[in-house]
Regions:
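N-terminal leader segment of winged-helix/HTH proteins
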Residues: 1-46
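Short amphipathic alpha-helical elements of helix-turn-helix/winged-helix folds
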Residues: 54, 58-62
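A short, conserved structural fragment
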Residues: 92-102
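Short, cationic-aromatic polyanion-contact patches
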Residues: 102-124
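Amphipathic alpha-helical dimerization/coiled-coil segments
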Residues: 122-142
């Protein structure tokens, strides 16, 4: 029997494409991703937030250092640049980020992941893809 839910706009009911069991497989995957994310920061729950996910993901996607003012905007759920700077400063203090002078503009600073953090994230994303493929296979079998 197909379950019903509201459409994305919240109006009309729609049939679900996947079963409760398949949805549960997805939730197991997201829990696994969260636990793995926490291991990147050696269990430090201060870094278990969407703010750091946004920041680290964007910095990982940029192979070259980015202006600190640009990095402030990576944390989409934080509206205050001052507050975003506090998060960045905490990551610098923990040794996850490198801040250096911008050789092209003395008024700005550049941010990048430390080599160790980049390697941790490389491994994290690699293991997620493996787990995602395994989860997809389990979902297909249902």
């Amino acid at each position: 029997m197909k379950e019903l839910s509201l459409s994305p706009n919240g109006n009309a009911p729609m049939s679900l494409k996947y079963s409760h069991k398949q949805h549960n497989e997805f939730l197991i995957l997201t829990d696994w991703i969260g636990r793995n994310w926490l291991q990147i920061f050696e269990g430090n729950t201060d870094f278990y937030t969407s703010h750091y996910w946004d920041l680290m993901k964007q910095l990982w996607q940029n192979p070259v250092p980015v202006r600190k003012t640009d990095a402030l905007g990576f944390m989409t759920s934080i509206k205050s640049p001052h507050t975003a700077a506090k998060y960045i400063d905490a990551a610098i203090r923990q040794g996850y980020l490198i801040e250096k002078e911008n050789p092209d503009d003395a008024r700005s600073r550049l941010l990048s992941l430390t080599p160790e953090m980049r390697e941790r994230l490389d491994k994290h994303f690699d293991s997620i893809i493996t787990e995602l493929c395994d989860t997809a296979e389990r979902i297909k079998k249902e």
